[in-house]
């Protein structure tokens, strides 16, 4: 017997996975941050699709993709290159900070100190120090050399914290020498610390909305801030005041980039404009370009003749900067003459983000519509894309594909990353709620009367964790096969599987194929919730859900022997043909020919009543069930009748009558609960 660690007081857990291609070469959502390694021309982009991608900006070819860096499972909000480009630090909405080998693209370690979204990073190059901050109001300082030395055995790291923030932090900046660190938050103020002592030195007021972006001058004497109030402010830290307010945007300023001499500001805004402004003479400004969506991040190209820009869209574009002898932005000449910029120098095309999703009534397929109006059908159970429909009428496709069948919700869909993320849990939506007949599409089965039932949630969890062999588990009995998976299908091995707290932090992320690894297996053993191990390891069967209902004769019955209602209970997936059989056999005491799956009973009944032609007919051809004055299809299950026909919160009520006259004595038999157990 395997002993599973339940992680004591840990919060309730959920399991999620992403339906996606094995390699996603394009961003599928907005891009939050950029970092350029000028040594080799590699551009790193932090996506809202949870993926960091690396691009070769030195090639003229359209294909600039080098590799993806994957380990986050929510928006990557910020990244910084450190150690002369050898390492990269990332911050994410999954509440983690991750340390990467930038050249090889793998995650070296994960820091879980923050308790909410990590929004911003700051880097002091001369000291190899990184700061992280987020919605938990906390700022932590990290020694990069210590972070990059972490191993599985040497996994302890100490951090300093900067306290005093009273609201969520959205921006952070340090100068290269690490003498000043500045934070901006929804307090609408700037807080300044000395990171060497972790002491707060001052706070600066002036903005009227959230401070979204910050830059500190190399000498640590000045700070430039951009705010959702639409202004750019220049602050003198020695004087502890704002010395310049710049109004060049109509909406919030979300990104700032400074010239090397700290004289020119390149700003990107929610108004979609990128503008170059001379700091000492704000009237000396020029529009670089108007993007197609709000601007999220800016970064120089290699020779600083252009600026890379990211937006809410997934494309990354490089725009030519207005120049004069290639040195307007660095010369600081007051009488320099602007030359026309705004030419698109390069474009890294992104993919479409899914914006709409409908779960079909069968609770197996979902239909999505993306930002390019492409409509796609996904198979949630098999974790695959089923059909690309192209640009079609979305609502019409949903209507056309929705069947009149009711199956309980057993998963939810999250589109935050731009790709369909399916969430399984035990809270508001029970992932074991969907019991269906096997003809729902697993093996070839065209018989609607089949008695075999399957549970979608159980099958899917078994497929997602097919390769998991728990440590310290008992060796399989030689007489019993080592059963893995669900016996019906497998899911793509590249599928990311995430274990996380409900509404909270990520605990574990791995690919389906990696569950066989020793470290991953141990991690799963320590983090997987009991409801997962119950079905995947212990092979327990989820409980059936039952429906109470009343059964009474129809007013048109010719010889109703009983007029009283009988209250019965049955599994919710029982088809109405079973109710017909119950009426015929137990209420009317007639001979029946049960549906497929009861061959022995069928043969016995045939032999005992071979001379009765009517008794050879199935029960559903001899009995009519009515509900709310509607004849019920015998292939419908109880939950579908309750949802589509009964439509009331009270107990479901059926009326029955015969389609032709039969002799019966009218005695009532066992309850349907007892009958359904026989099948």
Swiss-Prot record:
One of its GO terms (molecular function) is ubiquitin binding. WD repeats lie at residues 26-65, 71-110, 113-152, 164-203, 206-245, 248-287, 290-329, 349-388. Residues 594-615 are annotated as: Disordered. Catalytic component of the Usp12-46 deubiquitylase complex consisting of Usp12-46, Wdr20 and Uaf1; regulatory subunit that, together wtih Wdr20, stabilizes Usp12-46. The Usp12-46 deubiquitylase complex associates with arr/arrow; the interaction leads to deubiquitination and stabilization of arr/arrow. Regulatory component of the Usp12-46 deubiquitylase complex. activates deubiquitination by increasing the catalytic turnover without increasing the affinity of deubiquitinating enzymes for the substrate. The complex deubiquitylates the wg/wingless-signaling receptor arr/arrow, which stabilizes the receptor and increases its concentration at the cell surface; this enhances the sensitivity of cells to wg/wingless-signal stimulation. Belongs to the WD repeat WDR48 family. This is WD repeat-containing protein 48 homolog. It comes from Drosophila mojavensis (Fruit fly). The gene is Uaf1.
